[in-house]
Amino acid sequence: MKRTILITGGAGFIGSHVVRLFVTKYPDYRIVNLDKLTYAGNLANLRDIEDSPNYVFEKGDICDLDMLRALFGQYDIDGVIHLAAESHVDRSIRDPFTFARTNVLGTLSLLEAAREYWDGKWEGKLFYHISTDEVYGALELTRPEGDAAGGESGGGPFGEEFFTEETKYAPHSPYSASKASSDHFVRAYHDTYGMPTLVTNCSNNYGPYQFPEKLIPLFINNIRHRKPLPVYGRGENVRDWLYVEDHARAIDVIFHRGKVADTYNIGGFNEWKNIDLIRVIVRTVDRLLGNPEGTSEKLITHVTDRAGHDMRYAIDSRKLKRELGWQPSLQFEEGIEKTVRWYLQNQKWMDDITSGEYQEYYQSMYKDR
């Protein structure tokens, strides 16, 4: 094999798309997928490539340094794409220690295993850390409506400011604080030891295989089962959305051509207020299910806002386009159509993961709001 790449969290939402892309695009690479298989990790996400000769799955915890040391030695790993993380803000508010353990100590353990194994022989090595735009804090909502596309109140900017690679960190949730800390550790390992590193910060992803604690698959599933659609506060918060396969393509480009020790922002230039996004989802699901227009609108239920709910995230990814030629390939309207169709056509996948522990979590999060 030409290279051996360790991808952590490869059974999760974004990770499974990255694993699939690398396994199929680079048959001369050996791809080692390390995943703990927590509630959000699902090997069914990779059923189509699990028998590929250049793919290996290893179950393990990134906080287990001894296991990581053995893994680097066993597979002679020369590149890391680190996606394994706890990522849901609501869960971080309820259980910040788990987020600190996985996102901070797990990243540190992985860095240390790589540093020890590579032992200063940095040529051909790379530690690529995937992070979030939430580390930057929040932006002001200075335009009540975005530059509407097709009459929708979404798609265009809701303010003058955007997160750039120079934006100072100002995390507001335990989740974003844990990711900010892990980002700093990655950069510190470059500055202190000379390890070749890269960090990227991405906006909200959507698409197939996303665990239904996140807004889009949650609401598709709730509409299907005629359950309430819980909207935090008035639903005025704004997020920038990127189709997950476009994110995977960006990771590929940056891993192979990015400048060592640099940071790249990955975004969709595609801002939507939560309430407007939800209405698009409602209309799309109703249309694809053959429901009369407006059937599911009445399921929208405003609930108590999340503590410390940031108003607006918006990524400026022009550096990535300018230096490496990447830009999103999918417009939001096309992406949300593909996404809704996928979940409706893969109801068994959804049913399999929305049982047991997930149902208990869902009730604990929303029953009293």
Feature roles, as predicted:
Residues P171-S178, P208, P212, I216, ...:
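The catalytic Tyr-centered alpha-helix of NAD(P)H-dependent dehydrogenases
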Residues G15, N42, S92, P208-P212, ...:
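Alpha-helix N-cap/helix-start motif
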Residues M1-N205, F255, K338, Y343-N346, ...:
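N-terminal Rossmann-like NAD(P)+-binding domain of SDR-like oxidoreductases, especially those catalyzing
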Residues K36, K179, K214, K319-K321:
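A general lysine-centric signal
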Residues K2-L6, I31, G60-C63, D147, ...:
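C-terminal substrate-binding subdomain of Rossmann-fold SDR/epimerase-dehydratase oxidoreductases
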Residues V18, L139-E140, Q210, L215, ...:
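Acidic donor-diphosphate engagement hotspot in glycosyltransferases and nucleotidyltransferases
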Residues L43-L46, L139-R143, Q210-E213, L277-R279, ...:
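Short aromatic-enriched loop/helix-cap "lid" or pocket-rim segments at secondary-structure transitions
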